[in-house]
């Protein structure tokens, strides 16, 4: 196994949260498909499940946005000359994930998987600031999600655009 996940639960309500094994499976698939090999380098990711207050504070501090958000990605910046397998940290807000799943009429597990994958791709350097970047990232997210047996996470948006 090339992946170690440090799962931190900082949410008061833990009912219905994905297990460490589920996060491991989703992130492992994202890393393998992005690298196009199951033999990607050894990697460590911290996933912290938080409530709205912590998400709000972090989103305001690091992105200047005065509200909680679904997922924040903090890539690890390795100091020069040091070899560490740390990819970075994902902060996922339980309440936002649950609200979005209901609003978007998605199965909760699928939305958790999607945000873990989305955040992992951000840690790998993907972004969606331009249409071209968004198309590349969303295409890879969809491919990964479908390989895991989930629907295209952007199907509702694509249907609206058509």
Curated annotation (Swiss-Prot):
One of its GO terms (molecular function) is metalloendopeptidase activity. Its main location: cytoplasm. Zn(2+) binds at residues 118, 122, 128. Keywords: Cytoplasm, Endonuclease, Hydrolase, Metal-binding, Nuclease, Ribosome biogenesis, rRNA processing, Zinc. It is found in: Cytoplasm. InterPro entries: MetalPrtase_cat_dom_sf_prd (IPR023091), YbeY (IPR002036), YbeY_CS (IPR020549). Binds 1 zinc ion. One of its GO terms (cellular component) is cytoplasm. Gene3D superfamilies: Metalloproteases ('zincins'), catalytic domain. Pfam families: YbeY (PF02130). Its cofactor is Zn(2+). GO terms for biological process: rRNA processing. It comes from the Bacteria. Its EC number is 3.1.-.-. Coiled coil: none annotated. Belongs to the endoribonuclease YbeY family. Single strand-specific metallo-endoribonuclease involved in late-stage 70S ribosome quality control and in maturation of the 3' terminus of the 16S rRNA. This is Endoribonuclease YbeY. It comes from Glaesserella parasuis serovar 5 (strain SH0165) (Haemophilus parasuis). The gene is ybeY.
């Amino acid at each position: 196994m090339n992946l170690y996940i440090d799962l931190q639960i900082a949410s008061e309500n833990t009912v219905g949260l994905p297990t460490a094994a589920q996060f491991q499976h989703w992130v492992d698939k994202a890393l393998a498909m992005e690298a196009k090999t199951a033999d990607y380098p050894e990697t460590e990711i911290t996933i912290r499940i938080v409530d709205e207050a912590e998400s709000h504070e972090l989103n305001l501090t690091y992105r200047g946005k005065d509200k909680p958000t679904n997922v924040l990605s903090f890539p690890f910046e390795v100091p020069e000359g040091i070899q560490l397998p740390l990819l970075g940290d994902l902060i996922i807000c339980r309440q936002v994930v649950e609200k979005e799943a209901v609003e978007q009429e998605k199965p909760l597990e699928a939305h958790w998987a999607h945000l873990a994958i989305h955040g992992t791709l951000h840690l790998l350097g993907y972004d969606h600031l331009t249409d071209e970047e968004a198309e590349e990232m969303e295409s890879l997210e969809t491919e990964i999600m479908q390989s895991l047996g989930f629907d295209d996470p952007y199907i509702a948006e694509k249907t609206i655009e058509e």
